[in-house]
């Protein structure tokens, strides 16, 4: 009989390193932006939403053969959920950085730029680690 190992899950949030993973639920669909709802605990009663909101965080889940699946995102919502004994419970919502583009209502006109240049400029406002792997040549567009 195979050994039964519980799934290992971990929360990594540099903005609040004292947060420990407790539970998670999420929604992930093809061609849609994911949303993870994470409950975490900490001995620190004063984790500030200002310190955490908009900052990167990740959850790792141990899957088959000890491999890990990582969910990387930004903290889109954060709040205290209550007290459990002497630990404080917090709720976080993680979303991909691309979600930030849905929060903007900015209108811009790009003249004499290629489509990849436009994408780099728009994405560059939100993600410093965006990498373009396009190889072709793209003509600038008038409007």
Regions found by a protein language model. Name each.
Residues 35, 120-143:
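N-terminal export/assembly leaders
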Residues 1-56, 60-70, 78-80, 88-101, ...:
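Juxtamembrane "anchor/assembly" segments of surface/extracellular structural proteins
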């Amino acid at each position: 009989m195979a050994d039964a190992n519980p799934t290992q899950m971990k929360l990594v949030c540099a903005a609040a390193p004292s947060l420990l993973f407790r539970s998670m639920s999420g929604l992930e669909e093809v061609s849609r932006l994911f949303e993870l709802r994470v409950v975490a605990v900490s001995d620190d009663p004063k984790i500030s939403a200002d310190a955490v909101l908009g900052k990167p965080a990740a959850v790792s889940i141990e899957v088959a053969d000890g491999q890990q699946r990582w969910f990387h995102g930004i903290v889109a919502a954060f709040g205290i959920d209550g007290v459990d004994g002497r630990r404080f419970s917090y709720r976080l919502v993680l979303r991909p950085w691309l979600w930030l583009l849905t929060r903007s209502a900015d209108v811009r006109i790009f003249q004499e730029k290629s489509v990849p240049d436009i994408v780099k400029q728009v994405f560059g406002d939100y993600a410093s680690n965006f990498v373009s792997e396009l190889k072709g040549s793209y003509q600038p567009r008038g409007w």
